[in-house]
Swiss-Prot record:
Name of the gene: argD
Binding site for pyridoxal 5'-phosphate: 93-94, 120, 205-208, 263
Origin organism lineage: Bacteria, Bacillati, Bacillota, Bacilli, Bacillales
Protein name: Acetylornithine aminotransferase
Residues annotated with N6-(pyridoxal phosphate)lysine modification: 234
UniProt catalytic activity: N(2)-acetyl-L-ornithine + 2-oxoglutarate = N-acetyl-L-glutamate 5-semialdehyde + L-glutamate
Species whose genome carries this gene: Staphylococcus epidermidis (strain ATCC 12228 / FDA PCI 1200)
Gene Ontology CC terms, in alphabetical order: cytoplasm
Enzyme class: transferase
NCBIfam families: argD, PRK01278.1, PRK02936.1, PRK04260.1
Compartments where found: Cytoplasm
PROSITE patterns: AA_TRANSFER_CLASS_3
HAMAP family linked: ArgD_aminotrans_3
Keyword check for Cytoplasm: yes
Pfam families named in the record: Aminotran_3 (PF00202)
Length: 375
């Protein structure tokens, strides 16, 4: 008997321990992790982060946002660098997107936001309403009004939906949940230029793509894009719950006293994890290594799977990789688990790989070998 709602399709396995890039179940079986807890433990189970959280645990766990927090300032500075942003901390990606939606509407005085079909931005009401998947929004009654949905990578589709009441566009640089679908560079260039011309805010959802996942701190850096608002979570706390919304300083007037808030946002334990995570990831050598390992993974998967009739395409950026297949990918996930490899699905027919950024070449080779055997 379970005391939990049945809203997750749980596998009959429980992980009780971990060692860097490996997971250990209650029967002491060891698994190579190509999921990072769905893009969360980007640095694996890292002892430096453990020590940072432990040190904070010995000081103060929580204090309300009615008082100063030097660790919030420190993490914000690491996220912002030389960019002209301000930061708001929350607990998750969906909360970061809720904050972005509120900021965009209040700052512009406009209500319409353009999102994209097949997108995913979260499951709370505002973020769910911005999600372009009916399976996410069905059966929950009326969604938040004001959202329109364009075809991803189709500039004319986007442009046709804009109006004088368009506050913002919200976009994932790579549509992760729908199949690891990267944005087209020309499309992003056209969208960026048009939005700047029309004073439409650009919200980039970096919840899954941010914090080094693609070999840049932020995936939008691959496109020379300067978003008005950035949302973050997942890898930011390397396993501890935290989200963040970064907004351009010229939007700061819209979030004055009492305009938005959260009880647990900026929690000191989560910030301690984020602080150490960013200290490690904000390193050019590490990020270059992610790009190199991502290229190695994609190229070798393409070579190994070239004669597999059920493989349509291998695609991705950095260590965010999708293998599109003709059959049900959940079969591959089950077989991979049996052989000691933890992987994910995305969309209807994509195997999603999100290994830790600290994955070794030898571990990548092992994963490729297993996938080649079972696909």
């Amino acid at each position: 008997m379970s005391y939990l709602f049945n809203n997750y399709k749980r596998d009959n396995i429980e992980f009780v321990d971990a060692n860097q890039n490996e997971l250990i179940d209650k029967d002491n079986n060891v698994y190579l992790d190509f999921s990072s807890g769905i893009g969360v433990t980007n640095l694996g189970f890292n002892m430096e982060i453990y020590q940072a959280v432990y040190n904070q645990l010995n000081l103060i766990w929580h204090s309300p946002n009615l008082y100063l927090s030097s660790i919030q300032e420190e993490v914000a500075q690491k996220l912002i660098g030389q960019r002209d942003y301000l930061a708001f901390f929350c607990n998750s990606g969906t909360e970061a997107n809720e904050a972005a939606i509120k900021l965009a509407r209040k700052a512009t005085g406009k209500s319409e936001i353009i999102a994209f079909k097949k997108s995913f931005h979260g499951r709370t009401y505002g973020a769910m309403s911005a999600t372009g998947q009916k399976k996410i929004t069905d059966q929950f009654g009326p969604v938040v009004p004001g959202f329109k949905f364009a075809i991803f990578n189709d500039f004319n589709s986007f442009k046709s939906l804009t109006s004088n009441n368009t506050a913002a566009v919200i976009i994932e640089i790579i549509q992760g949940e729908s199949g690891v679908l990267p944005a087209d560079p020309l499309f992003m260039k056209q969208l960026n230029e048009y939005c700047k011309q029309k004073d439409i805010l650009i919200i980039v959802d970096e919840v899954q793509t941010g914090i080094g996942r693609t070999g840049k701190l932020y995936a939008h850096e691959h496109y020379q894009l300067s978003p008005d608002i950035i949302t973050l979570a997942k890898g930011l706390g390397n396993g501890l719950p935290i989200g963040a919304m970064l907004g351009k300083k010229n939007l700061g007037h819209a979030f004055g006293y009492g305009s938005h808030g959260t009880t647990f946002g900026g929690n000191r334990l989560s910030l301690a994890a984020a602080n150490q995570t960013l200290s490690i990831i904000n390193d050019a050598d590490l990020l270059n290594d992610v790009q190199s390992k991502g290229q190695f993974l994609i190229e070798n998967l393409r070579k190994s799977l070239v004669n597999k009739r059920n493989v349509i395409e291998v695609r991705g950026v950095g260590l965010m990789v999708g293998i599109e297949v003709t059959n049900d990918p959940s079969q591959v996930v089950r077989e991979a688990k049996r052989m000691g490899l933890i992987i994910l699905t995305a969309g209807k027919n994509v195997i999603r790989l999100l290994p830790p950024l600290t994955i070794t070449k030898k571990q990548l080779e092992k994963g490729i070998e297993i996938l080649t055997e079972i696909i």
